[in-house]
Amino acid sequence: EQRYKLVVTVADVTTGQLVRLPWDYRRVYGLDPDEQSVADAVRASMSIPFYFRPVKLTSAAGRTSTLLDGGLLSNFPVDSLDRTDGRAPRWPSFGITLLPDLPDGIDTVLPDWGVLRRLGPPRLLDDVITTALVGRDQAYLNQPWVSARTIRVDSTAVGFLDFDITDAQVAALYAKGHDAARAFLADWDWDNYLRRFRATDPLG
């Protein structure tokens, strides 16, 4: 099933798991991946809770799942680019993350979160949503084999749900990405990466 050139991640909140589409259509839902809508999969992967309507998917067994933004469970699935046969990669693959460092509060990342504070204790809600959106990926990014191929772009100045950023903000974010990529590639060593993280057993 890994022959597809586009793979998106979604959070199936009905079954409580991260799903990679189209890879998991058959395994999780018993559906033929070639018969499923690409547009629906992409829309599900961006269905941020409280802001966009979830996507519903009915399995071959008749069970309907609710699909939301895959970032709820994994916002940086760079391992989707890896080979699955255990062999060393033939070329490098890089990930670019726009996740900010964990802020003191959620307002920097989700400026409209104040509307939802009334649902419970503000500090607890802040901590829970911050950890859900950022914390898990921060821990993942700190793994040496992930960090070694990750270009980190500081996006703290742009909120997670800023849909109407100005031209100046776009230019500033572009410049940060450009500078981060240049700095990363200046020190990138493909052979060293293979030795450290992708060495294989010559007899295997």
What are these regions (language model features)?
Residues 1-204:
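Patatin-like phospholipase
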